[in-house]
Amino acid sequence: MPANAKVTIRYGKYEACGTVEYREDRLDGLQAVLKADGHEVELKQIEDWNVVELIVNGETVYTCNITELDFGGDGKLDPLCAEALQAVQTAY
């Protein structure tokens, strides 16, 4: 995969503090890791709850539960961010 691939992060809303909303705080680390590797990142909201999907070249290359991602941060210590980056790097 070229270093400057376009990665679409599709994410759903999740419950926190008794409310269900779209929140991007748990995506900060994932975005940071992908951008540091030279990828262009686009965020898209979807109707599904508790889900994150990474799309490269129209293919879903990685999916996880959004609540399992670390809140905030740079993503370097989050094992799910490392898995997602590996999936993007091996996509074709």
Curated annotation (Swiss-Prot):
Q: Which domain of life is it from?
A: Eukaryota
Entry coiled-coil feature ranges? none
Q: What is the annotated signal peptide range for this record?
A: none
Q: InterPro entries recorded for this chain?
A: UPF0728 (IPR027885)
| TM ranges | none
What is stated as this protein's family in its record? Belongs to the UPF0728 family.
Q: Which PANTHER family match?
A: UPF0728 PROTEIN C10ORF53
Protein name in the entry: UPF0728 protein
